[in-house]
């Protein structure tokens, strides 16, 4: 089941990124809701928020390690729908950005809320998955008390 979540995230992420790359120029910004939400094509050569630019291979290694730990965790705790969903979202998002790093040397970002650095669907998937996993772990801790 986790692989279905991973596959859906990767497919959606890569399809949107392909459209952005085909239809927009780098740094082009299209207002969807003026001064609130734009589609802005950014080539992010760093990590989140563009930090540590040019560390492509470091990010590839970190991503592979994190995915490995998540898969181990998933297989040890299999059975919970929340674990399946959360790990699937994190792994799918991580793989979506990993594909970009390997293919292009950068990650394609495009969601621009004007008050936050530009990000993408894969980033959103990782954040939502991490939040769900933290919530699950917190609930498990409360049940164990």
UniProtKB/Swiss-Prot annotation:
EC number(s) given by UniProt:
3.4.23.36
Q: What InterPro entries is this protein classified in?
A: Peptidase_A8 (IPR001872)
Can you tell me which residues form the catalytic site? 109, 123
What's one GO MF term for it?
Answer: aspartic-type endopeptidase activity
A Pfam family found in this protein is Peptidase_A8
Q: What is catalysed by this protein?
A: Release of signal peptides from bacterial membrane prolipoproteins. Hydrolyzes -Xaa-Yaa-Zaa-|-(S,diacylglyceryl)Cys-, in which Xaa is hydrophobic (preferably Leu), and Yaa (Ala or Ser) and Zaa (Gly or Ala) have small, neutral side chains
Membrane spanning stretches: 1-21, 57-77, 79-99, 115-135
Q: A GO term (biological process) for this protein?
A: proteolysis
Location in the cell reads: Cell inner membrane
Q: What is its main location?
A: membrane
Q: Which UniProt keywords apply?
A: Aspartyl protease, Cell inner membrane, Cell membrane, Hydrolase, Membrane, Protease, Transmembrane, Transmembrane helix
Does this UniProt record's set of keywords contain Transcription regulation?
no
**Function (record text):** This protein specifically catalyzes the removal of signal peptides from prolipoproteins.
- The identity of this protein, by name, is Lipoprotein signal peptidase
Organism whose genome encodes this protein: Halothermothrix orenii (strain H 168 / OCM 544 / DSM 9562)
